[in-house]
């Protein structure tokens, strides 16, 4: 048995000396060889089967890791959407208020300005004393306000027609 081990050691020492000589000759030659470089640096991919248990466990770990993040992002998104909706409502109310103020200022400056053709129809038929609730008006309340204003405008037009007759 010792003879076999000694022969193995001698064979390995011979292999090591051959490799050292090869490395030395490569250093001395120092000529770039793309073929040699491509064969020496080529990687080999090894695929092996992964047990189904490991795959399922990895999926569950990923779900446990990602699910709270998704929930957190969803909550932040809902809060942000609520904030944006409130801001939109406030901007709509501010628009209505500024629209009425502008109409009131225009009617004070020039009573004929509302009847001129170059003035938008947006201001026709409105009274200067229109009130806009700035408290906590909802979209439904604003829509109802617009409908009521339109109905008021129609009634005023009918009244004007009746007065002219």
UniProtKB/Swiss-Prot annotation:
Residues 74-104, 132-165 form a coiled coil. It is found in: Nucleus; Cytoplasm, Cytoskeleton, Spindle; Chromosome, Centromere, Kinetochore; Chromosome. Keywords: Cell cycle, Cell division, Centromere, Chromosome, Chromosome partition, Coiled coil, Cytoplasm, Cytoskeleton, Kinetochore, Microtubule, Mitosis, Nucleus, Phosphoprotein. The modification Phosphoserine is found at residues 107, 116. InterPro entries: DASH_Spc19. Its main location: nucleus. One of its GO terms (cellular component) is spindle microtubule. GO terms for biological process: attachment of spindle microtubules to kinetochore; cell division; mitotic sister chromatid biorientation; positive regulation of attachment of spindle microtubules to kinetochore; positive regulation of microtubule polymerization; protein transport along microtubule to mitotic spindle pole body. Present with 639 molecules/cell in log phase SD medium. Belongs to the DASH complex SPC19 family. Component of the DASH complex that connects microtubules with kinetochores and couples microtubule depolymerisation to chromosome movement; it is involved in retrieving kinetochores to the spindle poles before their re-orientation on the spindle in early mitosis and allows microtubule depolymerization to pull chromosomes apart and resist detachment during anaphase. Component of the DASH complex consisting of ASK1, DAD1, DAD2, DAD3, DAD4, DAM1, DUO1, HSK3, SPC19 and SPC34, with a stoichiometry of one copy of each subunit per complex. Multiple DASH complexes oligomerize to form a ring that encircles spindle microtubules and organizes the rod-like NDC80 complexes of the outer kinetochore. DASH complex oligomerization strengthens microtubule attachments. On cytoplasmic microtubules, DASH complexes appear to form patches instead of rings. This is DASH complex subunit SPC19. It comes from Saccharomyces cerevisiae (strain ATCC 204508 / S288c) (Baker's yeast). The lineage of its organism: Eukaryota, Fungi, Dikarya, Ascomycota, Saccharomycotina. The gene is SPC19.
């Amino acid at each position: 048995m010792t003879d076999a081990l000694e022969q193995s050691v001698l064979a390995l020492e011979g292999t090591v000396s051959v490799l050292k000589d090869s490395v030395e000759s490569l250093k001395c030659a120092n000529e770039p060889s793309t073929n040699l470089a491509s064969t020496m640096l080529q990687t080999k991919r090894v695929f092996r089967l992964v047990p189904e248990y490991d795959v399922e466990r990895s999926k569950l770990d990923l779900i446990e890791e990602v699910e709270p993040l998704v929930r957190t992002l969803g909550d932040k998104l809902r809060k942000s959407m609520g904030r944006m909706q409130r801001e939109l409502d406030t901007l709509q109310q501010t628009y209505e208020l500024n629209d009425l103020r502008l109409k009131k200022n225009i009617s004070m400056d020039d009573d004929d300005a509302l009847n001129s053709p170059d003035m938008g129809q947006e201001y026709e038929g409105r009274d200067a004393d229109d009130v806009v609730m700035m408290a906590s008006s909802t979209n439904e309340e604003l829509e109802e306000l617009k409908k009521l204003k339109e109905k008021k405008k129609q009634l005023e037009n009918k009244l004007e027609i009746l007065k002219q007759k």
